[in-house]
Design a protein with these regions (language model features):
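N-terminal active-site segment of His-dependent metallophosphoesterases
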Residues: 1-38, 174
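Active-site-proximal beta-strand elements of phosphoester/diester hydrolases
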Residues: 3-13, 100, 140, 146-155, ...
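Short, glycine-anchored, charge-dense loop/turn motifs used at functional sites
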Residues: 6, 103-111, 241-248
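Cys-nucleophile CN-hydrolase/nitrilase-fold catalytic domain and related Cys-dependent amidase chemistry
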Residues: 17, 26-113, 179-206
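CN hydrolase (nitrilase-like) catalytic-core segments centered on the catalytic cysteine
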Residues: 66-86, 147, 153-257
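Residue-level detector of high-confidence beta-strand sites
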Residues: 100, 113-115, 175, 250-252, ...
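A short, polar/charged loop-to-alpha-helix boundary motif
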Residues: 116-130, 255-273
Length: 291
């Protein structure tokens, strides 16, 4: 029996990078005290969700893995606490900018980087202004405690993401996220968001862990953003499922949270074999997906 203790962290993001890193560290330490071995923080937690507006100055936030403050900080924390930490960050690689994850193993070493594949472009979720679509493909990391696959926010809406990660051997699926109110559509997408990922877990027989931010984030009108006045209310509701998609743990909409679940990885592997979903696949019939 291979058990792994996993945490999803839900936090509010302040305007100051140092404050957000301190908050994240406090919650990571709290998770480690509860026995967590793999800890997921939300998407782009270093700052407010800057993609709500378009400002050329924000390109300066992008950094390489070696330069990024959060990555370098949490390499030390991961080694001290012996935990795996996927860290979301705004990546600069030469002249190209990405929305990325650096996976830090429990020895403090960076195993590699995943770059977000699907880049949204909607009212106040204006990510195409800041990010180039990722070129890494869907990657799975063999960490000290489990083989983990990671998609970033909008990736979670695409079943292809989860299926590719499962085919690549992921035992757990992680989705760091920044999602909240819809500025144009008169809808609360929270339930839809959760059910989409529950379906990925059920269809692949792999647990899903989703970590979101929470709180109201407002944009102040300025000459640089064309006088935009707007706000997004991030609805939290981070959650963790089992391999059938059933929700094991869920956070409130507007509160800090450290969600903890224990997964039996051998049980998950056995269930995937028993159900035969991967045995009975017919890839030769799926050409329409890539047309």
């Amino acid at each position: 029996m291979r058990n792994v203790r996993v945490v999803a962290i839900q936090m509010q993001c302040a305007k100051d990078v140092a404050t957000n890193i301190q908050t994240a560290e406090r919650l990571v330490r709290q998770a480690a005290e509860q026995g967590a071995q793999i800890i997921l923080l939300p998407e782009l937690f270093e700052r407010p969700y800057f993609c709500q507006e378009r400002q050329y100055d924000y390109y300066q936030h992008a950094q390489s893995v070696a330069e990024n403050t959060a990555i370098q900080h949490f390499k030390v924390i991961a080694k001290e606490l012996q935990v795996v930490l996927p860290i979301s960050f705004y990546e600069k690689d030469g002249n190209v900018l990405y929305n990325s994850i650096a996976v830090i193993d429990a020895d403090g070493e960076v195993l590699g980087v995943y770059r977000k594949t699907h880049i949204p472009d909607d009212h106040y979720y204006q990510e195409k202004f800041y990010f180039t679509p990722g070129n890494t493909g869907f990657k799975v990391w063999d960490t000290r405690y489990a083989k983990i696959g990671i998609g970033i926010c909008w990736d979670q809406w695409f079943p292809e993401t989860a299926r590719c990660l499962a085919l690549n051997g992921a035992e757990l699926l992680f989705y760091p996220t920044a999602i909240g109110s819809e500025p144009i559509l008169d809808t609360d997408s929270c339930g839809h968001w959760q059910r989409t990922m529950q379906g990925h877990a059920a269809a692949n027989i792999v647990p899903v862990i989703a970590a979101n931010r929470y709180g109201l984030e407002e944009v102040t009108p300025s000459e640089e953003n064309g006088g935009q006045s707007s706000s997004l209310d991030f609805y939290g509701s981070s959650f963790m499922t089992d391999e059938t998609g059933a929700i094991l743990e869920q956070a409130e909409r507007q509160a800090e949270a450290v969600l903890l679940a224990t997964y039996d990885l051998d049980k998950g592997a056995s269930e995937r074999l028993n159900w035969g979903l991967f045995r009975d696949r017919r890839p030769e019939m799926y050409q329409r997906i890539t047309d």
